[in-house]
Every structure is written in C-alpha cells, then in structure tokens.
Amino acid sequence: MAHNIEPAEIRFTQSARKHRIGKARALYVLEQYQPMEVHDSHSGEQNLRWIGIDDRGLELEIIAVVTPEYLLVIHVMPYRFRRK
C-alpha cells in the first residue's frame, strides 16, 4: 500500500540511533522509497517499514509510527543485520 507521508515533523527516538546511522541517511530512504504497513505484535498497532538503499549504498530498514503531529522513527538498522 502506498502512503503519502508528509508530516510537518519527523522525530527520531534515541533507540533509533542505536546502530549509529545518521538522520540524513535515514531521511534519504524515507523520501526515496514507499513504506509497507507492518503489524507490531507488542503494541497491536500498525507501523510503517521502509527498506531501501541510502545515499552511500547501504541498505537500511526503518520503522516508524505515524502520529497526528509527526512521524516517529523508532528503528534504523542496516538490513544485513536482520536475522534470517
């Protein structure tokens, strides 16, 4: 499902910075790729997930929560770290 996400503000949680991926690199993926809806089994909410290659060629996985005021990025990680 395609989303036109254009909140006035994009915020990052501290845990989203755990893998030391810069905000600019994450923002590039958010702008260039379409998100997929994913179900959070812990909260029961629908989140958005992006998988895309940043401006330096690193494939990233990004997960965000949509609120009425802003997009809250809660997870940014190199996709190769994902357990198979």
Predicted regions and their residues:
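Ribonuclease/tRNase effector modules and their secretory precursors
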Residues: M1-K84
